[in-house]
């Protein structure tokens, strides 16, 4: 697309569609038949800091990359941070709506759907066939297991078991997804 940047380390599969004003930088691999909507940034440095002896925040190097599978759609104005040491991974057939954030070291499983405004903090695992409703916030380090579903605006602060529906602040289990 117009005004897009694809860095020299980026590896693109066949039939990748990149729309306008996209930035893809660092060690990024994108699979076949994947679409990246306008305004998205892939491979940005993650939000990781430590405090020095004087209490000043010092950036932690992010040496990993981003691996995006095949048949993925990344919506407009998404940000996907590269991993700290390991890669941030988005598996095949994942679909993200507009304005989603996927942080460093996250792993998103196959056929997972992220609706508008989802924010996933770092080092989080989202397994396969998960639905994250609009505005879902996921704290760092949790696991949302296969076939789980979050309600609109859910704040996920702990692991979500396979096939459960959670909602609320903080998110609580309501029922099985396929009752």
Go through the PLM ranges and name each one.
Residues 1-167, 171-174:
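Structural signal for interior beta-strand "rungs" in well-ordered beta-sheet cores
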């Amino acid at each position: 697309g117009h005004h897009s940047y694809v860095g020299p380390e980026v590896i693109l599969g066949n039939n990748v569609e990149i729309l306008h004003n996209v930035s893809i930088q660092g060690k990024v691999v994108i699979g076949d038949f994947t679409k990246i909507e306008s305004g998205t940034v892939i491979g940005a440095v993650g939000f990781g800091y430590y405090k020095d002896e004087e209490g000043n925040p010092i950036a932690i190097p992010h040496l990993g990359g981003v691996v995006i599978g095949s048949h993925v759609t990344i919506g407009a104005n998404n940000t996907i941070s590269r991993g700290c040491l390991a890669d941030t991974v988005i598996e095949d057939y994942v679909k993200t709506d507009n304005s989603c954030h996927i942080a460093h070291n996250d792993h998103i499983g196959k056929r997972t759907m992220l609706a508008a405004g989802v924010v996933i903090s770092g080092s989080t695992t989202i397994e396969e066939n998960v639905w994250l409703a609009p505005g879902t916030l996921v704290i760092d380090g949790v696991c949302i297991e296969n076939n789980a579903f979050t309600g609109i605006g859910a704040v996920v602060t702990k692991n979500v078991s396979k096939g459960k529906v959670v909602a609320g602040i903080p998110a609580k289990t309501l029922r099985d997804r396929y009752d």
